[in-house]
Amino acid sequence: MSLVPKKSIDDAVVKGKKVLIRVDFNVPVKNGEITNDFRIRSALPTIQKVLKEGGSCILMSHLGRPKGAKMSDPKPAKSVRGYEEAATLRPVAARLSELLGQKVEFAPDCLDAASYAAKLKGGDVLLLENVRFYAEEGSKKEEERDAMAKVLAAYGDVYVSDAFGTAHRDSADMTGIPKVLGAGYAGYLMEKEINYFAQVLNNPPRPLVAIVGGAKVSDKIQLLDNMLGRINYLVIGGAMAYTFQKAQGHAIGISMCEEDKLDLAKSLLKKAQERNVEVLLPVDHVCNKEFQGVDAPLVTKDVEIPEGYMALDIGPKTIKIYEDVIAKCKSTIWNGPMGVFEMPCYSKGTFAVAKAMGNGTQKNGLMSIIGGGDTASAAELSGEAKNMSHVSTGGGASLELLEGKSLPGVTVLTNKDAKAPAAAAAAGGDCPCGSGCAAVPAAATATVSMVLASP
């Protein structure tokens, strides 16, 4: 089986409609200024599609992790329920206005925005305040999520999801609204994310190398287990590499190690061997006695790490080996940095991998996918993000997809081959979302699984 194809925004009629778009504007903000607008820019094609065709946009997003108030809480006299200054989307509205070259209306309370929505005309854009100012958005109780979803759904006619970064969340705005409206469409960013991951997981150009880093083996167990049946090479870096190396009997000094995962590391290495997957681990290291950024850290001559030292990046010999394996592959998927790239003296390994992928993509047609989160940040910092085939906007979502899990925010969207509900067809009525589509009832859509081919 493969990823179930979903209807995209191109399948929806948006002219004259108020289109609810769940975007991912969870961007870094410092002193009221956005420091990286990548996620805002990534949503522009979907927004511009609606505006060009004469629809209006009602945008929903979260930012940060505010505590969240209850819908039943008394409304403050001079504020809104759940408001936190550090998590307001007002700076996003200002930046989006600059990018679109037009005014973006801002509703200061996402659940008290009916008057704003009612005034919208074709070509208008409205951004709702942070949906997570309300605890019901991500409540564990379905009835609470549904109550919030009904309020939001009443603002519009058509639902589009372009928030891959939160597709692994079962929330009022990701799964609740399409259930209320009876249909949901993938925006261009969501569609792009799904298509790239589907290709690399189900039918990639080969050889395929997975580059996996980060701090803990325990964080990547399911990813490694799922990917071993799909890849040709496995490159391991970051602190998780030292658990594998201790499991092989090497000295790791005072480097980070999950002692309770040594047997698991041995098991994964054995499974890789059984499946003819070549595993590459560091053969030298950049070390220090303390976790600090010094200009002249110790570089080991071989795989062994001296007593009293911790490894904080891969060494030059390892970099060359990793560059060579990337150069001979046709596809790469990268999740997790090779070292503490935030400190310049430990960034060489991570940046070298990024450069090797970027060069391979631009010069040799390598399919290169960055799995979001810290890896996306590292690619941006290295200057190589623009050279990749795809930089995912979803850290947690991409990780769960690589682990072989289905994503609730994708599963709920209308299937490409969906038929009109029998009752609606018999009555000859319009589809629930008002778009003219053949919509799937909520009950049917909710049971569709987004499944990857078994390794």
UniProtKB/Swiss-Prot annotation:
It holds the Pfam family PGK. It is found in: Glycosome. Mg(2+) binds at A215, D219, D374. Disulfide bonds: none annotated. SUPFAM superfamilies: Phosphoglycerate kinase. It catalyses: (2R)-3-phosphoglycerate + ATP = (2R)-3-phospho-glyceroyl phosphate + ADP. GO terms for biological process: gluconeogenesis; glycolytic process. Coiled coil: none annotated. AMP binds at A215, K216, K220, A239, A311, E342. PROSITE patterns: PGLYCERATE_KINASE. Its cofactor is Mg(2+). ATP binds at A215, K220, A239, A311, E342, D374, T375. CDP binds at G214, D219, G238, G336, F341. One of its GO terms (cellular component) is glycosome. Residues 417-455 are annotated as: Topogenic signal. One of its GO terms (molecular function) is ATP binding. (2R)-3-phosphoglycerate binds at V23, D24, F25, N26, R39, S61, H62, G64, R65, R132, H168, R169, K216. ADP binds at G214, A215, K220, G238, A311, N335, F341, E342, D374, T375. Its EC number is 2.7.2.3. It is an enzyme of class 2 (transferase). Keywords: ATP-binding, Glycolysis, Glycosome, Kinase, Magnesium, Metal-binding, Nucleotide-binding, Peroxisome, Transferase. Pathway: Carbohydrate degradation; glycolysis; pyruvate from D-glyceraldehyde 3-phosphate: step 2/5. Belongs to the phosphoglycerate kinase family. This glycosomal PGK has a C-terminal extension of 38 AA which is not present in the cytosolic isoenzyme. This domain most likely serves as topogenic signal to direct the glycosomal PKG to the glycosome. This is Phosphoglycerate kinase, glycosomal. It comes from Crithidia fasciculata. The lineage of its organism: Eukaryota, Discoba, Euglenozoa, Kinetoplastea, Metakinetoplastina.
